[in-house]
UniProtKB/Swiss-Prot annotation:
GO MF, one example: symporter activity
Family matches, as Pfam families: K_trans, K_trans_C
Membrane-topology annotation of the record: Multi-pass membrane protein
Protein's name in the database: Probable potassium transport system protein Kup 1
Source organism of the structure: Cupriavidus necator (strain ATCC 17699 / DSM 428 / KCTC 22496 / NCIMB 10442 / H16 / Stanier 337) (Ralstonia eutropha)
Amino acid sequence: MTQSTTSHYFVESPSTRALVLGAVGVVFGDIGTSPLYALKECFSKEHGIMFSPEAVLGVISMLFWAMIIVVSIKYVVFVMRADNDGEGGVLALMALVLRTVAPRSGRARVLMMLGIFGACMFYGDAVITPAISVLSAVEGLEIAAPQLSQFVIPITLMILAALFLIQRHGTATMGKLFGPIMTAWFLALGGLGILHLVQAPEILKAINPYYAITFLVEHALQAFIVLGSVFLVLTGAEALYVDMGHFGARPIRIGWFVLVMPCLMLNYFGQGAMLLHNPAGAENPFYLMVPDLLQIPMVLLATCATVIASQAVISGAFSLTSQAIQLGFLPRMRVRYTSAAEIGQIYLPVINWLLLVLVIGVVISFKKSENLAAAYGIAVTTTMVITTILAAVCMRSVWKWNPALVAVVGLAFIVVDLSFFAANLLKVAEGGWFPLLLGSAAFFLLMTWYSGRKLLRARSLEDGIPLEPFIAGLLAHPPHRVEGTAVFLTGNTESVPVSLLHNLKHNRVLHERVVFLTFVTRDIPYVDDDHRLSCKDVGGGVFILKSEYGFKETPDVQRVLDLADRKLGMHFELMETSFFIARESVIPSKLPGMPMWRESLFAWMHQNGAKPSDFFQIPANRVVELGTKVEI
């Protein structure tokens, strides 16, 4: 990261039009590809719906009002107001509401665990979205070219493998095409919808909520089951909030209301219109509404759109993991920047290959998009419920709304969310168990790391020596001073770094300038360079340098030293500076803390994390690592 964070997505602030186009290409990919499978799943034979014009009107009415209430009202109008210095998403919202509660209170722990669990469920989404999106697009070959049906899974696997293989090179160049391609996709959706709407305009009666309510009342059990499939039109709604920091709330709102929502509505109503005249089209309503001559081009366009939707989710997984590392919930991992122009363009090899294996496994195991649809909703509904809870806390604690108003708004949204959540629980046995298992495993790992780090800090403080009195005593009877600068990286400036104690014990020297450098992650996404550094002169050429970072930034030692030169007048010659880092070996023990098996898991995670020198981007030939053992 080599640029100011005051404009953290683009180097030059583009026009609103360019931001809207960018948002269309990135933010709406997931929700924009739902027409490929959502209505098809609603009329699945397994739901037992007696096909009739009333059933079509009822389902389309449910789709329409679900999108209005959940996306347009809940997310676009209310939730997107809950920004953390412009950033959105469940982790940013969690950090925002945690500022309003006592740090170590029970309420803070509950809110933290809710936020982390909601974030972890995104990993389930990150696995299923590429699989179901690309698979459903390629399944169009079964209609466009039936002789190629046997190649649907191999083609899907090749596309997905290629998508993950190019991640290491970055997608900044291709990203310029995302906006135009997705714009063409949405216009195609709208055009197809209009084509069938003019043939059966009576489908527009579904705008009246009477049809949704009547369907729910008269077909209670079947309607409740179908509700889980109706939710598929909402997958990707959370992305509007998550990507708010990249494009801003206004461009996303414009993109939604001007292009995306109208085109989606037209397409869903068009699919419904086709079903009124051709009930057999329920087998695959999206592709069967496409004229024969346009089948192959539509398969190609749909494949491009689903690849773009998958890319957005993969990038989201990288970003989420990076945030979790900065907030102290995951060990350090290698983070590579794939674009000099966009801070958001990062690549984490471990996450990339793990996602690739899981996505390929899911496609091979589930085989068809309708099988994956059962697994899709549960992860997204869980995150939505948690977002609603945290947003309600924000309304009361941050915005200071009247409790009665918070209760009315919060209750309205939570009832809708819980209805979808309950309907999706029915699908747990059919595949919903997979994202739940994946999210729960991620949550367990994150909480194990968080708890293990707390234990490690507690042990270090118990055995630690207060820093400033130690330095005062050391300077009173100084060891031999040598030329150059020693930078000791430490997580706690209150205690003497173990690396300094080892250096004094074995080398018996002290550099002419000693800097204790610590990185502190704030509960905001970005910290401006003017407020990043603070320095305390302890005397005798010894300094305590604190560098603050936001949870969406990655510390960079070279950048800190350059900033210290510009802002504080502390010049560092890199080739005359040695960086001392303590490499801790964690030893599980029977001391009070976590169960032994969980401490062993933490020790394994600690051992396999990226080296501090790699993570902090320190030249390898300037690093001195000193090992130490710590029992927890």
